[in-house]
Amino acid sequence: MASTSLLKASPVLDKSEWVKGQSVLFRQPSSASVVLRNRATSLTVRAASSYADELVKTAKTIASPGRGILAMDESNATCGKRLDSIGLENTEANRQAFRTLLVSAPGLGQYVSGAILFEETLYQSTTEGKKMVDVLVEQNIVPGIKVDKGLVPLVGSNNESWCQGLDGLSSRTAAYYQQGARFAKWRTVVSIPNGPSALAVKEAAWGLARYAAISQDSGLVPIVEPEILLDGEHDIDRTYDVAEKVWAEVFFYLAQNNVMFEGILLKPSMVTPGAESKDRATPEQVAAYTLKLLRNRVPPAVPGIMFLSGGQSEVEATLNLNAMNQAPNPWHVSFSYARALQNTCLKTWGGRPENVNAAQTTLLARAKANSLAQLGKYTGEGESEEAKEGMFVKGYTY
């Protein structure tokens, strides 16, 4: 354990704690040092953004009982892959038609508290000429926006990636706020088969922290998402070890950047074996490992944990979420799903106008199932075989 003097002398790490196998965030210097450091951080955070009260209110609204997030922020290229799967061309009109179907589903706001949009969607209108943002707000759904600019190779790493998009982020987030967005999302990834290297983990954590600070300064609640990819043959213990170290580093840099924890949301991966592992985990095992991770690494000041599905089947993602809500948690534990909400809906629609109502009914059924899972009341009865099919894609890009 490092001494207090070492912590004071080295406020900025020049060598990742990943390498040392320790986390500065959870060290315990003298009580006086903790009080002074916390007091200084608290004062800095409150003064850093004039949106502090609004950020807390927005985060609590999204983290409301029985509701979660609809992630519909796929890039136009990824949206094109989805459309291609049902025989449609990747045109703005077709993207608009599917997004209209999603945001205008009657009663969606009963189960969904927030919707993450791609930039095109934030400025887009429905096929009826109404702004997508306005349609969401009318359903009591908070509009959000994807702000990262995607993954690029991380030079000097073991074939790993880093997330770009910090350049110009302050002006973009300010514009997104004016357009009606109230929260933001930044997705970076960690690959277990490729290490992960200390460099990749530190880069991911630092980028998330800078994005979070900038977003809060513009009035947007940042969703912090270091996705640990499902790729690999590793067991659940290996996933846990990596996740524990990743989240330690993330929170260390969030604190360094004076990010207000009450005004953020997390979007973690569930702790599962690698998708190519011979071992499979039950929902109870996934819940046990995941909740242990959260309790060891996530401060209770964070209002909401909104899990990503990461290629799990629709049913698997819902069952795992339900298992995590069988006992009280210090945070709102819910969902932020894309494919695990949209997949069956997309196939039901098939690009045909006459199928819109049926597709919306399918979307609502999936959203309701996850709403029940957030309350710990999902039974899994009546699920189709299609909803049980896994959606893992090796090397998946978003």
UniProtKB/Swiss-Prot annotation:
Entry-linked InterPro entries: Aldolase_I_AS, Aldolase_TIM, FBA_I
Keywords on record: Chloroplast, Glycolysis, Lyase, Methylation, Phosphoprotein, Plastid, Schiff base, Transit peptide
Effect of K394A: Loss of methylation, but no effect on enzyme activity
Any single biological process term in GO: response to abscisic acid
Expressed in which tissues: Highly expressed in rosettes leaves.
Active site: E225 (proton acceptor), K267 (schiff-base intermediate with dihydroxyacetone-p)
Consequence of gene loss (knockout): Reduced growth rate. Unability to accumulate starch in leaves during daylight.
Enzyme Commission no: 4.1.2.13
Catalytic activity: beta-D-fructose 1,6-bisphosphate = D-glyceraldehyde 3-phosphate + dihydroxyacetone phosphate
Residues with PTM N6,N6,N6-trimethyllysine: K394
Organelle targeting sequence: 1-46
Keyword Plastid: yes
Broad class of where this protein is predominantly found: plastid
Binding site for substrate: R95, K185, S309, G310, G311
Record's function text: Plays a key role in glycolysis and gluconeogenesis.
Family: Belongs to the class I fructose-bisphosphate aldolase family.
Protein name: Fructose-bisphosphate aldolase 2, chloroplastic
Organism classification: Eukaryota, Viridiplantae, Streptophyta, Embryophyta, Tracheophyta
